[in-house]
Each structure stands twice: as C-alpha cells, then as structure tokens.
A protein has these predicted regions:
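Donor-sugar nucleotide-binding helix/loop cap in glycosyltransferases
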Residues: 1-176
Length: 176
C-alpha cells in the first residue's frame, strides 16, 4: 500500500491503513519490504473486492459485513434504529455516552466525518445499502444534514451467505 509519490499525509495513510485492516481487505505482513504502509498486502478477501471493483455495490456490502464487527460500525448498527432520521448533533450526543473521555468532542466529530464520507462516496449510502443520508455538497466539502438507517432493498444472496458466515465466525466459530 503506497501513495506512489509520498504526497498523502501520514495521518490520512494511518486512517486508510486502519480501514483496510478493519474491512479485511489488507493485513500487515512484517516480511514484506518497505515502510509500515507498504507492508500491508491484500488478503484473499481484498483480492475479491478488487475483482468486483471499488464502486460495486456487492463489494461494499461485503465490506460492510466485515466492518459490522468493528466497534464503530457495530455501535451504529446497534444504536441507530431503522427508519429513524438522525441529525449529526443527535448522533454526536448519543456517542457522548460511550465516549465519556472525549471532552472536546473531536473523537465524535471524526467518527461522524468518516461515516459521512463513506455514505456520500460509496454504495453504502448512494445505493441505500446501509443508510439514506441527506447532505449538501459544495466543491469538496460535504455537510451532513441527516441520516436514516435503512434496509437493503435488493440484497445479493452471496452477501447474505457471507454475513451468516461472519456471524458464525464471530460467535466462537459456530458453523453448525
């Protein structure tokens, strides 16, 4: 994993590295050559995602199956009810109960900012796989107005099977 010409700040590379790791797309390989970023190599799952393509709704639904078991996405899934419209401020307030040490609110802001980007730039929001969102876009700035968790209207059977596999895996390898 490299930005090619070293123009991306390390903070953004760290965030991306964490995302691809959480999503199961790439894993750290200490035997690989290069710096801490280029030591991340594609997993079998990551290769499948690349085959499907970065804008493919099935790819993003599969990624969501992995992300559902990370603390941030798991919180959204368990705390934002389906069909209820939430403002950014209401989500920040809800996050405040689980992020008590986030006195300045920077952590809550960062979580909401990341969610806003994922919803506005991927099929998870654009094709209503995870949520419907209302945002205002001006130049490169996106302002989230509201979001509502929704059900996926046309789920792909392979994604459902993968989600069941992930569920079994996260229940202590209960596959029967």
């Amino acid at each position: 994993m490299t930005d090619g010409d070293h123009q991306i700040p390390n903070k953004k590379k760290d965030a991306f590295k964490n995302f691809v790791d959480d999503a199961g797309i790439a894993k750290y390989d200490k035997a690989a050559e290069g710096d801490k970023y280029s030591k991340y190599v594609l997993t079998d799952f990551g290769r499948k995602i690349c085959e499907l393509g970065g804008y493919d709704s099935t790819a993003w639904a599969l990624i969501l199956c992995n992300l559902a078991y990370t603390p941030a996405y798991n919180w959204f899934i368990n705390n934002l009810q389906l069909g209820v419209c939430y403002s950014p401020d209401s989500i920040k307030d809800m996050l405040g109960y689980v992020m008590e040490n986030d006195i300045k609110g920077l952590g809550r802001r960062n979580i909401l900012s990341a969610l806003k980007i994922v919803l506005s730039q991927t099929p998870l929001g654009k094709e209503r796989i995870f949520a419907e969102f209302n945002a205002e876009e001006k130049k490169e700035k996106i302002t989230l107005k509201s979001m509502e968790r929704c059900t996926w209207e046309n789920p792909v059977p392979e994604v459902i099977l993968f989600s069941l596999y992930k569920f079994a895996e996260n229940c202590g390898d209960y596959y029967q």
